[in-house]
């Protein structure tokens, strides 16, 4: 249906100064009689005093008169708000949001009116100040060392807020922890860096670069590279809990890098805080002078100015080596869908700018730099970065494998003579199989792993096929936490339902023909006749515990084939236990048992120390005379019987009964060491026989026995998914 033409549409007329003169409406057509009639309205507000004009759509069709009136009302309100914004002194509570919404005059835009009417001048100018260059003598690069839950993220938040790097209205808890998993677990997984501008009491401006570090032992290599990019570190210790195991591990890494360490006693506001006791602990255990340790409460903001002053006065500036060939240390990287891999680095020597051709010295790949900038903590592009500065670069890099943590960046035109020391390839230590519950999700699982690998060069995976589980992947991880994080991200971010096999470690198998092979999958272990010996990785584990739990923890270590090395009392009430332990004994529930037996008070840290020969055997689980590969495990010879007995008994409870008897066996080679049987369901074939000749009954029973025999030879026992999941959980506990 055609829309009637309106010779004289409703409109808005304006004078030169923007005021509304009149409105005209057509009287030739009654809009109430013609609902489909459209009124055309055009509105324009001309801003006075040099402000830019705001123009609404020149033509806008409205389907009734009320809508036209509504538009006219909005235009009038817009005009009224603009006039009110000119009188900012009379309306101090409009705030930054109102000023941005109604586009206040340019001379007012740089003032951020807070809720209490006071101007906060740490808005637009602060970003410009952070980009301003300072002498290299005024640069400080530092990190924060702390155990889990000792307040590292809270302290970082306060430093960002106190220096004005992040405005109060933008602040949130754990600002540098972007992943949901990091917030939920209270740990740092992906590194972050933040550039802060700090002005001391004399008015001198400093550039402070905070390089965050992950706190878990799985990422100890990343921690070492982050510390290598700094000249100092804040040692944060909970004033109520004292020194923990992970604190010691990271402090030793910092001392190896010759960093200036500033002790900070956090959480002094807690009722159980005892700063004097913790000072003595630090001096006795680590050997640091804590007479000038800073008392701090990051939550309440106590001691933050003292920490900033200590960073400026005690941590030395970087060396002025800007004239030398470029050498930059990569301490983190991540994959961006649009720019490729974005590299976080510290310039150790030389300069780098946009357009330079750079080479990653260990991977031997070359790229042209598309963008360089600083992290404040958002990415802010700059023209150039020189020695001592921390920033990022993007160069259309397609894989994080080309820009690994610890690699050295140099320019193609003027290459450095040698790379920075300390580079290592991240080597997976723990392996497990990942299988989708729904076989149709195999392709989705592969795509999800490929996406995760773009951000995580340490993650390795390869296809794996199982007769019982179908198609899946054998994945390698840095440690148990790394494995848990990847599994949880696959399930949460990609919506996958997964079955995970029992975790295993990498074994070295010496074969009879003189070759040495590495095996991470128990089902791929060579036959016993081809094996000469098997080596397994060992770790040095240090346990810090109150003296009341020394006995239970020593029992736990001995149960896991631990070799006692040392015990010492670090204080009157706390002791340190050192053991050499097989890594395979830790990948189960060792940490859970540690916390359970110590009531949560003990902490641990470990480091891999090499391989040792052990008496290991492959334990196969056979169901109805068929080996089930995902249930195979490598165990010590002394534990094989108990593990086999536990697995067969559990499977007997979980597998449903069939019309034929199902044998469940735990085998070492061809030798059965444990066995259980699931009895067959009985079908009463004699129910219709009410008497008569016994030969009829014998004939029916014989026919039933032949059918069961044929069914057993041809039948297939499907282990249900919940049984698999339960038995795999049991494997993680008993292995």
UniProtKB/Swiss-Prot annotation:
Catalysed reaction equations from the record: GTP + H2O = GDP + phosphate + H(+)
Class in the EC hierarchy, top level: hydrolase
Single GO BP term: positive regulation of translation
Cytoplasm as UniProt keyword: no
Keyword annotations of the record: Chloroplast, GTP-binding, Hydrolase, Nucleotide-binding, Plastid, Protein biosynthesis, Transit peptide
Main location: plastid
Family: Belongs to the TRAFAC class translation factor GTPase superfamily. Classic translation factor GTPase family. LepA subfamily.
Region feature (Disordered): 1-38, 106-126
EC number: 3.6.5.-
InterPro entries: EF-4, EFG_III/V, EFG_V-like, EFTu-like_2, G_TR_CS, GUFP, LepA_C_sf, LepA_CTD
PROSITE patterns assigned: G_TR_1, G_TR_2
Cellular component annotations (GO), alphabetically ordered: chloroplast
Superkingdom of this protein's organism: Eukaryota
Gene Ontology molecular function, alphabetical: GTP binding; GTPase activity; ribosome binding
Keyword Coiled coil: no
Protein name from the UniProt record: Translation factor GUF1 homolog, chloroplastic
Basic and acidic residues: bias regions: 106-115
Residues binding GTP, per UniProt: 146-153, 212-216, 266-269
Stored HAMAP family: GUFP, LepA
Transit peptide location: 1-47
Subcellular location: Plastid, Chloroplast
Function in brief: Promotes chloroplast protein synthesis. May act as a fidelity factor of the translation reaction, by catalyzing a one-codon backward translocation of tRNAs on improperly translocated ribosomes.
């Amino acid at each position: 249906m055609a829309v009637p033409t309106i010779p004289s549409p409703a409109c808005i007329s304006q004078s030169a100064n923007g005021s509304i003169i009149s409105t005209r409406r057509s009287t030739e057509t009654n809009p109430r009689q013609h609902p489909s009639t459209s009124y055309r309205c055009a509105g324009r507000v001309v801003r006075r005093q040099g402000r830019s004009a705001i123009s609404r759509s020149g033509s806008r069709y409205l389907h009734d008169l009320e809508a036209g009136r509504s538009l006219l009302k909005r235009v009038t309100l817009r005009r009224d708000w603009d006039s009110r914004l000119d009188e900012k002194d009379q309306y101090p509570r409009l705030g930054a949001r109102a000023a941005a919404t109604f586009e206040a005059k340019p001379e007012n835009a740089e003032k951020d009116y807070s809720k209490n009417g006071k101007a906060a001048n740490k808005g637009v100018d602060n970003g410009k100040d952070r980009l301003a260059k300072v002498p290299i003598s005024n640069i400080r690069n530092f990190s924060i060392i702390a155990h889990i839950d000792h307040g590292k993220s809270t302290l970082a938040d306060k430093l960002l807020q106190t220096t004005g790097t992040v405005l109060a209205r933008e602040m949130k808890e754990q600002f540098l922890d972007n992943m949901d998993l990091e917030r939920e677990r209270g740990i740092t997984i992906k590194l972050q860096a933040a550039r802060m501008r700090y002005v001391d009491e004399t008015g001198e401006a400093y550039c402070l670069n905070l390089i965050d570090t992950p706190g878990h032992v799985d990422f100890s290599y990343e921690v070492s590279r982050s510390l290598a990019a700094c000249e100092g570190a804040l040692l944060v210790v909970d004033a109520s809990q004292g020194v923990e195991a992970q604190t010691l591990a990271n402090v030793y890494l910092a001392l190896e890098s010759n960093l200036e360490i500033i002790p900070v006693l956090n959480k002094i506001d807690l009722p159980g805080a005892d700063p004097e006791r913790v000072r003595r602990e630090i001096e006795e255990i680590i050997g640091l002078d804590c007479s000038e340790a800073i008392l701090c409460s990051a939550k309440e903001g106590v001691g933050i100015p003292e920490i900033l002053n200590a960073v400026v006065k005690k941590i030395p500036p970087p060396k002025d080596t800007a004239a030398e060939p470029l050498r930059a240390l990569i301490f983190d990287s991540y994959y961006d869908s649009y720019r490729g891999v974005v590299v976080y680095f510290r310039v150790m020597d030389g300069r780098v700018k946009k357009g330079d051709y750079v080479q990653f010295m260990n991977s031997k790949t070359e790229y042209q730099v598309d963008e360089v900038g600083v992290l404040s903590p958002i990415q802010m592009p700059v023209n150039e970065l020189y020695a001592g500065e921390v920033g990022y670069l993007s160069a259309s890099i397609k894989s994080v494998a080309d820009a690994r943590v610890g690699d050295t960046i140099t320019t193609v035109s003027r290459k450095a003579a040698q790379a920075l020391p300390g580079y290592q390839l991240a080597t997976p230590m723990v392996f497990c199989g990942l299988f989708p519950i729904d076989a149709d999700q195999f392709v989705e699982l592969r795509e999800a792993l490929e996406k995760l690998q773009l951000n995580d060069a340490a993650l390795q995976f390869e296809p794996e096929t199982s007769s019982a589980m179908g198609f899946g992947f054998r994945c390698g991880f840095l440690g148990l936490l790394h494995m848990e994080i990847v599994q949880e991200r696959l399930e949460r971010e990609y919506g996958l339902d997964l079955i995970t096999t029992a975790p295993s470690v990498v074994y070295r198998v010496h074969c009879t023909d003189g070759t040495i092979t590495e095996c991470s999958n128990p089902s791929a272990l060579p036959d016993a006749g081809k094996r000469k010996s098997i080596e397994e990785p060992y770790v040095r584990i240090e346990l810090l515990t109150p003296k009341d739990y020394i006995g239970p923890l020593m029992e736990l270590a001995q149960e896991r084939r631990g070799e006692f090395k040392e015990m010492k009392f670090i204080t009157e009430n706390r002791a340190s236990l050192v053991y050499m332990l097989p890594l395979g004994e830790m990948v189960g529930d060792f940490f859970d048992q540690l916390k359970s037996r110590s009531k949560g008070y003990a902490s641990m840290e470990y480091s891999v120390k090499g391989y040792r020969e052990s008496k290991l055997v492959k334990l196969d689980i056979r169901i109805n005379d068929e080996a089930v590969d995902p249930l195979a495990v490598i165990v010590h010879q002394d534990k094989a019987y108990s593990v086999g007995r536990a697995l067969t008994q559990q499977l007997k409870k979980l597998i449903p009964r069939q019309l034929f008897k199902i044998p469940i066996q735990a085998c070492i080679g061809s030798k059965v060491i444990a066995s259980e049987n699931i009895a067959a369901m009985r079908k009463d074939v004699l129910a219709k026989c009410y008497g008569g000749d016994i030969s009829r009954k014998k004939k029916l029973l014989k026919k039933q026995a032949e059918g069961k025999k044929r069914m057993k030879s041809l039948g297939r026992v499907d282990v249900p998914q919940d049984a698999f999941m339960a038995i795999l959980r049991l494997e993680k506990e008993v292995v």
